[in-house]
Every structure is written in structure tokens, then in C-alpha cells.
């Protein structure tokens, strides 16, 4: 499971997710990708479940790139604990995702295989996403 090796501070505030992604919003490595359409937190277990679903479907074919990393700790107090007595201990890690962020990329497979693999990954995630395809440069020209 993904998590930082070490962090400067063990606990963080929740924060707000405002605006669209300005970084990591284009395809970098593969030909196909999965792009977030709404903001949210994606946990390390959800990322791992999506990765396993994709890699099992494409088998030995292509390559999968994970473009997000869970670097935010989420704390939780034990069950049946009274209010007060400080913040709970870190329970799991999340990646903060803004709309437009590319979550996963796939390369080295056909479009049909990539579409189905990313569809399987979509169902493991708590946010709406869309399939992304790399646009080829130098396509049609307007000259007559």
C-alpha cells in the first residue's frame, strides 16, 4: 500500500478542495488515462484496488502508471471514546484530488483493452472520472 516513508508532521487538518487541477492534468507517460471530474479524497486502499483491477485485466500486456500519491494522513478516534482528550491517531492515508487531475495512465495496449481496464478501475474509485486519450499532433490541416 502507498504511504510516505516519513513525514514532518504526523497529523494534518482536513482542509478544503477549491478549484481545478493545474498540475498533473495532461497525459505524460501512456496513451490512455483516467481523469477526475470532481474533487475528493482517494485512499491508498482504493488506489491499490484500482491498480490490481487494471493489471489483472491487461495481464502481461501494457504498463500502468499511478499519477497520484496518498500523502495526507487522516486521523480517527477509537470507537466509544468520549469527546475531547486530543486528536485521534493517524488511521489511513489519502490523495487529495481536484477536478481535471489524471489519476492513472496506461500504455502499450489497444484502445479497447485500455478502455475496459480503466472502466474496471473507475468502479473502485469514490469520484466520477472519464476516459482520456492522447491526441496525436499534426493530424488534419486546414489547407485546401
UniProtKB/Swiss-Prot annotation:
SUPFAM superfamilies: Ribosomal protein L16p/L10e. One of its GO terms (biological process) is translation. The keyword Ribonucleoprotein applies. It holds the Pfam family Ribosomal_L16. GO terms for cellular component: cytosolic large ribosomal subunit. Keywords: Ribonucleoprotein, Ribosomal protein, RNA-binding, rRNA-binding, tRNA-binding. Belongs to the universal ribosomal protein uL16 family. HAMAP family: Ribosomal_uL16 (MF_01342). This is Large ribosomal subunit protein uL16. It comes from Caldanaerobacter subterraneus subsp. tengcongensis (strain DSM 15242 / JCM 11007 / NBRC 100824 / MB4).
